[in-house]
Amino acid sequence: MKIVRMMGLAVLTASALVLSMTAASAHDPDTAEGQAAARTFMADHIPAERHAVTGTAAGVPCVNGKADIYPCKNVDLLSVLPLSGLGGGNGNDIWGWTDPVSGKEYAIVGRTNGTAFVDLSTPTSPKFLGNLPSNGGSSSWRDMKVYKNHAFIVADFISGHGMQVFDLTRLRTVTTPQTFTADTLYKGFGPAHNIAINEETGFAYAIGSNTCSGGPHIVNIQSPKAPVKAGCVSQDGYTHDTQCVVYRGPDAAYRGKEICFNANEDTLTIVDVTDKARPVQISRKGYSGAQYSHQGWLTDDQRYFLLDDELDESRGTDKRTKTYVWDLAKLSAPVHTGVYNSPATAIDHNQYIKGRYSYQANYQAGLRILDVSGVASAQLSEVGYFDIYPSGNAANFNGAWSNYPYFSSGIVIVNGIEQGLVVVKPTFTTAGR
């Protein structure tokens, strides 16, 4: 969703500006409506986001609730690489890559004006390797995922952006910062809000594009430098985010199928995409308190799904972060079983589950880590946090946009709208297990 972000001021959503529009026109930069929404955001709010208190210390343990200037619990600060050292702009999404040859870990850092690549071999002193410029202008929404040592990058509100494909093995020989070019540009869509990849099958799902009614645009990326369109999921309209997996959960009817779990603005929508030419919607379920179904992630056993709603805090009277718990024992009948209410006041954005923990990027409240071992009874508990926006907590759009917790080293990388790359490491003994 296009959410206009203002520091300390009222939040205005693009949906409020375009109530009479279809989702496709509101998100398409080739329409007058989409252009108006983009101008409103870009002209009014990006400059204000750049002013934030950012610490510069490295290798600082969390002691008595602080690491340098940052509030924390059970998470140490390793380093901060500010936006000025990443190519400028504002931060957005982030992902990681581990070189299968050297074992080196790298951050892939989205920004309004491009994508930065950072060597994390020494996490207390990350090394900027260079920038892949945006294809056709700036965007506050850039997203990337990795498959077969290639990064696949999309951006919203840029009509000709398409999907950039970048061979990450090129980073092995970089000694000084470079300005890179993409290896391939897929032009089957222009803008896209997000991208998901099922690494097991080799299919990418570009979502919120100007095709497929805003639903998943499926691309075969098994040959990364030769992507080919494989299908569309358009039955339920605009999808904001998705997780697509080869299903191995409790519902025997769908085991072995490729299933997408879509956050579709006001529902959790589950789709069988095994046959890319003929996807089948399994279920579509709303929930009490829905304002904007944003993103979610499956537990490792694929029995439960944790969903974040991006607007329930700012529009509600209780501004605490909420996480919606779903029981997926039957994919045709998902059940919303409860809500976890965080002690922190903030909007949730992106979360990823690794083992028994959910790593949440919750804007002004920073990185929050939840123990999900009690998910069967909808009982979650916070075991750690690192607040990259120390100025305060509120249901506004500043701070942590996303995080990546899947490095074998145990470090977690966070991308802040105003802060840039923040590298941290949880200290509780069972982190990520």
Segment roles from a protein language model:
Residues 1-5:
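Positively charged n-region of N-terminal signal peptides that target proteins for export
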Residues 8-20:
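Bacterial N-terminal signal peptides
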Residues 25-433:
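Feature marking well-ordered beta-strand scaffolds used for ligand recognition
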